[in-house]
């Protein structure tokens, strides 16, 4: 959000997959940086969690595959939630059929951050990036830690400051002993996770 999205106070941040561990972190960080946060999730239960974590508005989307009409309808939902100027930053954790409607709701010169794609690798019509004059940016934290260790250390220090200030807090929804680690993976695969799923070593 900071390095690739250049987030600032007053931005509109649209988060796809906002109720998982990464999504909840994005909600909290967005609010800490002064953004208006729109959380896109797949159920009422996840919508309630997103609101509890600080989301200003929530969009509940269906399950893909989407036909053209469904894709257009989702884009309209995103636009309505983001407001007339669109989302300054789209934080896409899910990919697949969800990505194109989000690009359609992006602001002029917005940033589309590709964070993950459990719903499949998105096929974006590149003409949309021209029409919106927007940037599509990959976000690969694992490689970043190796290539930019000093910057990463500074970010970690900032996260601890935000934690101390009570602006962010890990939300653990399930714990499994290592012997039942498969259940944790299944929970993630079935998109049942809300917040972090932890595997304990004891």
Q: Model-predicted segments: where are they?
A:
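Phosphate-coordination loops involved in phosphoryl transfer and adenosine-cofactor binding
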Residues: 9-10, 87, 109
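Glycine-rich helix-loop-beta junction characteristic of Rossmann-like nucleotide cofactor-binding loops
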Residues: 3-7, 81-84, 104
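N-terminal Rossmann-like NAD(P) cofactor-binding module of classical short-chain dehydrogenase/reductase
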Residues: 14, 88-91, 113
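Short internal alpha-helix immediately C-terminal to a glycine-rich phosphate-binding loop
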Residues: 1-33
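NAD(P)H cofactor-binding loop motif with strongest signal on the N-terminal glycine-rich segment
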Residues: 17-18, 94, 117
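Glycine-rich phosphate-binding loop and adjacent beta-alpha segment
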Residues: 41, 50, 97-168, 200-202
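Adenosine-nucleotide cofactor-binding segment
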Residues: 31-97, 151
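C-terminal capping/lid region of NAD(P)-dependent oxidoreductase domains
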Residues: 160, 165-174, 182-202
């Amino acid at each position: 959000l900071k390095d690739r999205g250049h987030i600032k106070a007053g931005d509109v941040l649209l988060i796809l997959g906002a109720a998982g561990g990464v999504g909840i972190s994005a909600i909290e960080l967005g609010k800490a940086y002064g953004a208006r946060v729109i959380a896109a999730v797949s159920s009422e239960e996840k919508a309630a969690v997103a609101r509890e974590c600080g989301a200003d508005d929530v969009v509940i989307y269906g399950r893909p595959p989407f036909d053209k009409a469904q894709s257009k309808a989702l884009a309209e939902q995103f636009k309505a939630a983001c407001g007339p100027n669109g989302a300054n930053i789209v934080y896409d954790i899910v990919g697949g059929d969800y990505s194109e409607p989000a690009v359609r709701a992006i602001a002029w010169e917005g940033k589309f951050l590709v964070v993950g794609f459990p719903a499949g690798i998105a096929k974006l019509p590149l003409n949309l990036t021209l029409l919106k004059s927007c940037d599509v940016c990959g976000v690969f934290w694992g490689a970043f830690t190796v290539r930019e260790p000093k910057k990463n250390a500074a970010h970690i220090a900032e996260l601890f400051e935000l934690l101390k200030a009570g602006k962010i807090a890990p939300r653990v929804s399930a714990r499994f002993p290592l012997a039942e680690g498969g259940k944790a993976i299944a929970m993630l695969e079935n998109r049942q996770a809300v917040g972090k799923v932890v595997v304990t070593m004891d």
